[in-house]
Swiss-Prot record:
It is found in: Membrane. It is a single-pass membrane protein. InterPro entries: FecR, Ig-like_fold. Coiled coil: none annotated. Keywords: Membrane, Transmembrane, Transmembrane helix. The keyword Heme does not apply. Gene3D superfamilies: Immunoglobulins (2.60.40.10). This is Uncharacterized protein TP_0484. The chain crosses the membrane at residues 39-56. It holds the Pfam family FecR. The keyword S-adenosyl-L-methionine does not apply. GO terms for cellular component: membrane.
């Protein structure tokens, strides 16, 4: 072996972390020279390192796009992947990253995204969807659906041409148009959700499309079939939450119909079930015909209870519309009691605490009282949170005040729909006392009594917080007798609503009232009011004398122990339906009745001396709406034997638990 070969046999290659692959020489000789072959190997290794680095940097550039961004992508659920210019590399995207020209985005199962473009146009992407973006400056903006479902909304006032491609079909949007597209290259469905658009097919034909009026279906061969739906549901919208009034419980339904081809009738179906296996309400509607309008809006209303509902339209000749779900909650507007509207509270002495009271509302967790010196509540607002429908607020000085009450329900809902109107009142101190307002009998009122011997008339006036005594003056205008003057005292720290009960004969009377302070300062009298007392048509002298019985106060339900919606979870936990109410003074027993709200059938009636009852026979219960009915009873002398009935409505739903509200972008219904 020559010296040269001996020296090369000692040449080794091994990696160094900081320098890459470099040759290291170990030799017994002091100096060794490399051949051209060795240098070539070294250069090849260095080129491989540079190539790998360039590929990695290019992949990073692809993940961030290229050029000026045309928008940003955001994710409702999970994330999506993207590739650039038809490259094979799919990269995972982060929320809020830029989107570039010629990007291809892909979502998987459970992934939902939205792209907000720089011109405020929006592209909603459903799961399992692939879409290609092509926005070339301000002149042309294209979106191509490869497969899946999208919703593209064009921003109003944008001069660029917005088009959506699917298969061999092109849709051109104008104005603030919005299009829903579902399908792929072979078969797709197009719906114009808002505005107008033009549809261009493979044969070069152009078809106009209008809002809700036409559905276009493109086939593999490029032909287009235009469908004319007879009816298009509008309201209630999908997963809408409706707040209905206590006295009406009315839900409005709105849909569009083609007035030029409208059918003579349509059936509105409402059910608790999505498959309409049990139809709660079915109403056949005869529709008007308007020949001058291409589309006509139809409206109707139905009384519905609380809970989740589904509705659809069934034409006389045609398929039913897609079912829409909505929820109903019963709402009762808070009514203000005291201080009365436009009341003037005058005080000679120190101003006492002001009493605020209002009507109670079912299922309320908390009331919020807002008190301000400004009508718009923009400044100087005092807020009080409480569980009872009244409160005494001290420390109010002279001036004009505005107040309202907003209830908060068990679910945390606080909405202006439930809030009261804005009340106003004034406080004055050291001024002349103002006259009270006479309420009943009203001016020129005729009181007809069937009992000759007991013509009882009740006089009332508005409450005066500072009043400690009321002075009533009643004069018979048909006789020369002196007017009847009497006083009624107001005990300290009581609600100052006072009445006078007087037995009057037939005739015409005038009356007025004044009030006095604790220092016997008397206010001016109210305006004179005239009324007439007459004998009724059914007055009998032989009618036995009767006396007024004291009415039992009706019980009140303990709402925190009685939910309005009974679910499977509740039944598994309690194994019974529970009813609880407050005790009534002088009541000796209570009757509890469980009734079916729809059929009015009595499921069970029980008598108890307690204030709670449990219905454990759940085997005979079905889903639906029910009523608890409670009535108090007594046998004490001087009391009416039974109080007024109180009713509590509730709904049982076991087979279908509450589901969260679906997001707007992911539910596309096509037929």
């Amino acid at each position: 072996m020559t010296d040269r070969r001996r020296s090369m046999s000692c040449v080794h290659f091994f990696p160094l972390k900081s320098r890459g692959f470099l040759p290291t020489l170990t030799s017994k000789k002091r100096s060794v020279k490399l051949s051209k072959q060795d240098a070539t190997v070294t250069v090849v290794i260095l080129l491989l390192i540079l190539l790998l680095g360039w590929g990695y940097s290019r992949a990073l550039r692809l993940s961030q796009g290229k050029g000026n961004p045309i928008g940003r992508v955001f994710f409702y659920k999970k994330t999506a992947t993207r590739k650039k210019n038809n490259q094979a590399l799919w990269l995972k995207l982060k929320d809020g990253v830029p989107v570039y020209h010629r990007d291809v985005l892909r979502t998987t199962t459970g992934s939902e995204a939205v792209i907000v473009f720089t011109d405020n146009s929006r592209l909603d992407i459903a799961e399992n969807t692939m879409v290609r973006i092509s926005h070339t400056g301000m002149k042309k903006k294209d979106v191509r659906l490869v497969t899946g479902a999208i919703r593209y909304a064009r921003a109003a006032g944008n001069p660029a041409a917005h088009t959506v491609h699917v298969g061999k079909t092109t849709i051109s949007l104008s104005g603030d148009g919005q299009v829903n597209v579902r399908g792929g290259e072979r078969d797709s469905t197009v719906e114009i959700a808002r505005g107008e658009a033009l549809l261009h097919d493979a044969q070069g034909q152009t078809l106009p499309l209008q809002t809700f009026t036409q559905l276009a279906t493109s086939r593999e061969d490029g032909t287009v079939r235009i469908l004319h739906p007879t009816f298009v549901p509008l309201l209630p919208d999908q997963d809408a939450l409706l707040l209905t009034a206590e006295h009406t419980r009315s839900v409005g339904f709105v849909w569009l119909g083609d007035a030029t081809t409208v059918q003579p009738s349509v059936r509105l179906q409402i059910s608790r079930y999505a498959d309409f296996s049990v139809i709660e309400t079915e109403r056949k509607l005869t529709l008007p015909h308007e020949a001058n309008a291409s589309r006509t809006t139809f409206k109707t209303s139905e009384r519905l209870g609380e809970g989740r509902w589904f509705w659809r339209l069934v034409p006389q000749n045609g398929t039913a519309s897609a079912p829409r779900s909505f929820s109903v909650r019963r709402a009762r507007k808070v009514m203000l009691h005291t201080p009365r509207a436009q009341a003037v509270l005058s005080y000679r002495d120190a101003i006492p605490p002001t009493l605020f009271s209002w009507t109670s509302v079912e299922d309320v967790e908390q009331y919020r009282l807002l008190l301000s010196s400004r009508a718009d509540f923009s400044a100087d607002v005092k807020t009080f949170s409480l569980r009872t429908p009244e409160i005494s607020v001290p420390g109010l000085g002279e001036g004009t005040y505005f107040w309202k009450v907003v209830p908060r329900f068990d679910e945390g809902i606080e909405d202006p729909v439930f809030a009261s109107e804005v009340g106003t009142f004034s406080i004055k101190q050291g001024k002349e006392l103002h006259a009270p307002v006479a309420l009943f009998p009203a001016e020129d009122e005729v009181l007809e009594h069937a009992d000759r011997e007991n013509r009882m008339v009740i006089f009332t006036c508005e409450p005066i917080p500072e009043a400690r005594r009321y002075v009533w003056t009643v004069k018979n205008m048909d006789a020369n007798a002196s007017p009847l003057v009497t006083t009624t005292s107001v005990p300290f720290l009581t609600v100052p609503m006072r009445s006078l009960r007087a037995r009057l004969q037939e005739g015409t009377y005038q009356w007025q009232v004044a009030w006095e302070t604790r220092r016997s300062d008397r206010s001016p009298y109210s305006a004179l009011r005239a009324f007439t007392v007459i004998e009724g048509m059914h007055a009998w002298e032989e009618e036995p004398e009767t006396r007024d019985l004291i009415a039992l106060r009706a019980p009140s339900f303990v709402l925190r122990d009685m939910p309005a919606l009974i679910t499977e979870k509740y039944l598994l936990q309690h194994r019974a339906l529970r009813c609880k109410w407050t005790a009534v003074h002088n009541a000796q027993r209570y009757t509890v009745t469980l009734k079916n709200k729809k059929t009015d059938a009595v499921l069970q009636t029980a008598t108890t001396t307690g204030v709670e009852f449990s219905f454990t026979n759940l085997a005979h219960l079905e889903e639906g709406s029910f009523h608890w009915v409670i009535q108090a009873h007594t046998e004490q002398e001087g009391y009416e034997p039974a109080s007024a009935q109180v009713v509590r409505a509730f709904t049982i739903r076991v087979s279908e638990l509450e589901r969260p509200r679906a997001k707007e972008i992911v539910h596309y219904e096509y037929h």
